[in-house]
Amino acid sequence: MQTKTLLLCTALLQAFTVYADDFTVASPDGHLKATVHLTNGKLSYTVSRDDRTLVSESPLGLKASMVDLTENLELVETAISSVDDSYTLPVGKRSQYRDACNVLSVLTQKGTWRLNVLFRLYDDGFAFRYEIPKYGGHASAYLTSEASRVCIADFRSSTACRFLGNSGGNDPNYPYEGLYAKYLSWATLTGTGDGRYNTPSLIFNGKDYMLLSEADNRSFFCTSLMKAEQQEGEFSYSWTGQTKDYATEKDHRILCPLPAYTPWRMVVCGDIKTIFETTMAENLCPPTTMTDLDWIKPGVAAWYWGGSDGGKGEIQKAYGGLREGEWAHCELAADMGWPYYLIDAGWSSSWFPDFVTRANEKGVDCLLWQNANLNNSQDFSNANMDATLKKWKSWGIKGIKVDFWEDDSKETMTRMENLYNTAAKYQMLVNLHGCTRPSGLRRTYPHIMTQEGIYGGEQQFWNPKLNSAQHHLDVLFTRNVVGAMDFTPGDFATWRGSILTQRSQGHHLALLTLFESGIVHIAESPENLRYFIGRDIMKRLPATWDESILLEGNPSAYATVARRKGNDWWVSGITVNERSCRVKLDFLEEGTTYTAYIYRDGSCRSDMVFEKKLVVNGNNLTIKELSEGGFLMQISPQDNLDVPPERTTYEAEATANMLSGEAKRKTYSSLHASGGGFVGDLGLGGKLQFNRIKAGHTGEYILTIYFISRDTRQAKLLVNGEQVGDTITFRSNGDCTSSWDPDGMSWMMIPVTLEEGNKNTITIQSFDDLWAPNFDRITIHPVFSDDEATRILPTTREEMFPINKVTDLLSPFNPRKADAYSLNGSRLTESAPQGIYVYQGKKILRK
């Protein structure tokens, strides 16, 4: 680090100017200026960019129980310094960081107490913090409040998340897991709740964006909220307190040993590209003292709780138990080449160590969920944290997800920092949940991989309509700016195949790289991903980046982001309304030919298509995005990466198909249904026969049926006149849209055998006394390149886990030998010819 210091009382050079009681510091590029005023014993400041006021005169100062440091202050000295430091991090939006700023220090005194105000000016914003030096014989201070304000000079709008209340308050929701909203007037901002908002909050003044947040939240202080005061544009800082019971405390004092510091009050200033690309939060934190960082490895993780739609009991029962469900998802991580598997709530020390050993044999490392208070009789208090992590380290655990902090008081910040230090001692990665937002501490503690503090993807299981494209834009330009965000993307469909999302499949795939997180927890099941069109690109997914740039962005409409890992670029885009996105490829290296692997919206939200194009620097790609749509593409110098097999779509309502009985073609304009219609009223023995199904070769193909059903229904499936299985059970759309709205779409994937040519038929026939669902379309594609040549799969989701617990057979925890069983249809029997049998992609050898 290069640091230069100069007392202002001796000289001021270049960008630094002093006027009597005014002390000015400029950013390194000279465009941004902050002036600290000392007038009649009171401190205040203003900020401008190119002589245009961003922050009008705003008060400064602290109050303590022993002294009021907001008035009657006398100047001791002022100093200026500069910082120009470069550093690397193993995780983040970039690998190379530069911390370049100019610093102003204004030291004042009142009696035997001193107050130092530190300002940092970066090219992309400013920050200030307080220091109470150890002086006058004082060893500590009880701080009670601060006078700091950020008075926006020309307030136009704010994108902010209302504070919902700590666990000690009246609201049961954790404060950082609410939705952001756009406030177009100061009156609506002050009139919502108690006027307090989480940070970060995004402000717009008609020309500039300003992101208000904090940096360097550690054990020495609590975090703060932003409170909208009655004066338009005026934000104050509201502390979260000394202890977790702050909401019921009568004494709100914060005890601080001297020297005492507050976190940095941070304001990023500039256009929306500047907001997205800033690394100011990391720059404001101290460098790490850790010397060995080689063990810190970002990556993608499978996650049973997310893959089972939030740990729903019916799914756990279907797998045969929690342990068996966990193992199925651990094998998903192995199959996808992901380095991690997260074991969530409910694990037991009676089986977990063996689970980790077997996972390691498959090349998967395990992460462990832990309640911040108590879980499985493990004492996670400060006193016993070391012993607990030492034991988990002996089990082979690589990282921990610590949940339910539900507080960000000084007491909790102290406990979190104890966790950071203890986890570093045992080389364990850290993921915080039920917690506050990040504050740049991955510079100090690089093993902090990600954290929650977000209304994330898991909310899809309960409130699918609220996790909208607008919400995703809101958090992209607020919460994810200040640090890694464990959004838990995926959610393409529920375990039973219901497409709960109101966004497109392309949109949900885009979120995998649109958001930044050192551990990307995929909320999906093995069943959904086995034949998913995005499977190949998900196998290659990075979790940390060498470079991140915003190609285009409007916080109320759309965003297109490019992130680089090595020689490959990953470009993702989302939108609120339908649009054509023009991606300028001027960020590619000149002279190199790349291949773009593009996954984009298809004909409707439940449809996604793949295409492959050669591109070079200077090319433009135009990609159509549906409303609530999106895309993801990997641009690589390699032209031979795995791609999904070609899919062919057949509309149910097409005139080439044969309908019989009560079945009818119906016209409907739908978000998730394609082709403008569907086939309904299929009952009482009626048939829907898809004709002219084409196959390039004789062999196994994957049939995906898109259907609409408010309740569970059954039918027969016939391929070329021969029935597949006994009964196909179509599960209810569940919590999708109500009634028989085609926007409530589900899918089912079934292996079938087709003959070469275009004369294959696929028939769905209702039973004589039953009604089948409504049908939108089917798709046909060959098996993936890494699938078995022959695969025998159950034909219904009920039979996927039959009474004899096929999953037990495949689980390493079951003492029964696999070679004692064979497949008969989709069920196992006690005797069979010798050979290899396949269930869910797992080989079963009968000797």
Locations of regions flagged by a protein language model:
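An acidic-aromatic substrate-binding cleft motif
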Residues: P257-L332, M336, Y340
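Aromatic- and carboxylate-enriched substrate-binding clefts and catalytic-loop regions
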Residues: L342-S504
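Carbohydrate-binding surface patches
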Residues: N554-E590, F631-Q634
